[in-house]
Amino acid sequence: MKKLSVLAISSFLIVDFLFPGYHHNSNSTKSRNLSELCYNNVDTKLFNELEVRYSTNQDHFYNYNKTIRLLNENNNEKDGNVTNERKKKPTKAVENKLKQPPGDDDGAGNDAGNDAGNDAGNAAGNAAGNAAGNAAGNAAGNAAGNAAGNAAGNAAGNAAGNDAGNAAGNAAGNAAGNAAGNAAGNDAGNAAGNAAGNAAGNAAGNAAGNAAGNAAGNAAGNAAGNAAGNDAGNAAGNAAGNAAGNAAGNAAGNAAGNAAGNAAGNAAGNAAGNAAGNAAGNAAGNAAGNAAGNAAGNAAGNAAGNAAGNAAGNEKAKNKDNKVDANTNKKDNQEENNDSSNGPSEEHIKNYLESIRNSITEEWSPCSVTCGSGIRARRKVGAKNKKPAELVLSDLETEICSLDKCSSIFNVVSNSLGIVLVLVLILFH
């Protein structure tokens, strides 16, 4: 009887170990079925693809107002009261215009040869309508005090040779429309005080050679639209105080070479969108105070001077807390359904990656769970030489792993009892 019992128990244990596929027990390292689904970013995008969203179509009803236009309707015609009375226009009286014989109708004191209508005191040769005091040769319409040779319409005090429309005080040779005080050679539309050679539209005080639209005080060579105080070579739209070479849209105080959109105080070489105080070389999107080399998306509030990623001490504290969370998540996952279709949660993924930050290599890490669906990760080739503290999500390659067969307490107890029974029967036989 004892031999029969030993034989039965031994047979059960032999079958249990030789054919693991027919019972609940299995080696966790040999029964991991890793799916080929790979993804590079461990974030909510992985789970958004698995969600089924239902949307309801809403019907929109529109009320259309019909507009009826009544064209060419006459109420009088409908009533039959059409009157064709018209007001008679009075005939114009015939005016008899008689040509006056040519003569000298100049005012008292005009020199000989002045046309009719000149005021007293005009020199000979002035056209009709000149005010008193005009020199000989002024065209009709010049105000009193214009020098000989001024075109019609020049204000009093313009030098000889100024075009029509120049204000009083313009030098000879100024184009029409120049303000008083402009030097000879200024284009039309230049404000008073512009140097010779300034394009039309320059403000007063611009140096020679400035393009149209430059504000007062800009150095020579500035493009149109630069504010006062910009150095030569600044693009259009730069604020006052920007150094030479800054792109359009940079705020005042940016160093040379900053891209458009950088805030004031950014060092040379910062990408567009960097906040004030970022060091040179920061990528676009870095918050204020981030040190050089921090990747885009680092949260605001990182102390200036911290190296990329947090300090080693902070990382150790974080890893310690994350390991506790990861172990808790592993325990919870073991008690859940073993169905591989249930993907790991976002929190589980983040905690697992933090727990293996210091030990992750180019080889695949163990699966994050011992039962059900989890993830495993490894470094990308480009992040081979990075320190653990410098690793970000984009430096890791991850994929889902699932364990279809899981060991239970029943298997452990049954195997243990079987071994104990065999030993008892053998030793005390």
From Swiss-Prot:
Name of protein:
Circumsporozoite protein
Query: For the region 52 X 4 AA tandem repeats of N-[AD]-A-G, what residue ranges are annotated?
Result: 110-313
Origin species: Plasmodium malariae
Known function? Essential sporozoite protein. In the mosquito vector, required for sporozoite development in the oocyst, migration through the vector hemolymph and entry into the vector salivary glands. In the vertebrate host, required for sporozoite migration through the host dermis and infection of host hepatocytes. Binds to highly sulfated heparan sulfate proteoglycans (HSPGs) on the surface of host hepatocytes.
Compartments annotated for it: namely: Cell membrane; Cytoplasm
Q: Where is the TSP type-1 domain?
A: 355-407
Residue ranges with Basic and acidic residues bias = 315-334
Using the UniProt annotation, give all residue ranges assigned to the region (Region I): 97-101
**Segments of this protein annotated with the region Required for the binding to heparan sulfate proteoglycans (HSPGs) on the surface of host hepatocytes:** 87-92
